Amino acid sequence: GGGEMNNSAVVDPSGAGLAGKWPNIFLLALCEVLALSLWFSATAVIPELKSAYDLPDWQASLFSSAVAMGFVVGTMTSAILGLADRIPSKRFFMIAAFIAAIANGLILVLPPTSMLIIFLRFLTGACMAGLYPVGMKMVASWARGDTGLLVGLLVGALTLGSASPHLFKITGGVDWRFAIGLASVLAIVAGLLINFFQPGPLEKKSPPFRPAYLLHAWTDKPLRLANLGYFGHMWELYAMWAWIGVFLHASFTQSLGAGQGDAASHLAGLVTFLVVGVGTLGALFGGLLADRLGRTTLTMAAMAISGICAIAIGFLFGGNI
């Protein structure tokens, strides 16, 4: 189309950089922030749903875990079918954002205790395969000796987007529907804006999926250790992201005392946004340092600190900030 740009048109002839690189990177990051608000849109309002509709604990847990399960299924399906190479990245992102926005928005027309919501959360998670991994492919097309920084920017955008529903909940008052609806609207905006993104000159196709890759991921020791470390990190991180809001709500409810339910809810939402959102700075600075200090060293230090925090926070229940 008229918005396409060939590789020769985006290479800076001076060799100093890639013309149009940073506007495109920031546009992509913005789209990720807007679209990834869908991930925890329903999780952010679990305390309100439990209070107003007696939502069972097991069903509340599925609000978050269904998204993760959908993401795994969606990512594997995309990899096996090679969707990221068969479908132009911008179009893939747009379609995924639109479908996820619709699935998320349909929550508003269902009873909060309906099991159909779990399926909609699963579908939302599956669509994330067209947003986050595809976004990584898009940002890599602009990498030139600064892969760590670019990946850090994108992970930071993911983090900020994941934190945003907790901020929506605060600005929307006590109505949980506001956070759900706003997340869908922002995802649609992301799907429209992504069409203005121009891929960099290093864009390339991924090799076709082969089942042997699964075995290689285990038999190659460095890759196996990296995957196991990432698995443990994700187990901790997404458990924290999913439940820190519920934990803080219960903690502040106890510490503030009876009759302070609204204050506890707003305070929990604000602190949860800050707790998750501060990861944006961690991702940015981590990306900068990774290219200088080494990814393995930085990752080990970050995971050690994160693990210590995870152990310590349980002993602080019922305390204030």
Describe the predicted segments one by one.
Residues 42-44, 222-280:
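Extracytoplasmic gate region of multi-pass secondary transporters
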Residues 103, 115-130, 320-321:
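Hydrophobic core of transmembrane alpha-helices in multi-pass small-molecule transporters
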